[in-house]
């Protein structure tokens, strides 16, 4: 068991739909991939009365003009004992697509984010993680994670 799994998170990472940035590209789709341990949930951008939404801050990045999240449709979870404590979010996995706008068209990018998210099971906790991805300039090919991103994009 990884240390993060003690807090309900199996992994948090940045993934990309493409292996590289095309020389004509002004943007690329990347995603924050959050895999949760069984029975844990995380929150949507508007999590309900008591939740903590996933938030990120761009740090130490190169060729990054802007990052815009595209939230997949969430689900409402109702607490059977305390129905007023319902939450809006995701279970098992959240792949949050991000539109990465480049400062310089067709140049590689290094993206580093500080991510914070609330997770709940019988108790709730805040998890913080620094994640990064390097995207070189080149001939882009689909990554093995491209399908995960496409599935989430279809739910936006």
What do the PLM-derived regions correspond to, one by one?
Residues 1-156:
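Extracellular/lumen-exposed scaffold segments
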């Amino acid at each position: 068991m990884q240390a993060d799994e003690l807090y309900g998170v199996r992994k948090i990472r940045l993934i990309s739909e493409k292996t590289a940035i095309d020389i004509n590209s002004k943007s690329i789709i990347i995603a924050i991939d959050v895999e949760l341990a069984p029975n844990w949930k995380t929150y949507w951008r508007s999590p309900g009365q008591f939740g903590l939404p996933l938030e990120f801050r761009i740090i130490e990045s190169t060729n990054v003009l802007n990052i815009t999240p595209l939230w997949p449709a969430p689900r409402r979870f109702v607490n059977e004992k305390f129905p007023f404590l319902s939450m809006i979010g995701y279970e098992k996995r959240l792949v949050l697509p991000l539109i990465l706008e480049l400062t310089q068209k067709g140049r590689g990018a290094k993206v580093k984010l500080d991510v914070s998210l609330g997770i709940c099971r019988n108790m709730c906790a805040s998890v913080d993680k620094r994640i990064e991805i390097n995207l070189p300039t080149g001939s882009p090919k689909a990554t093995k994670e491209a399908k995960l991103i496409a599935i989430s994009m279809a739910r936006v």
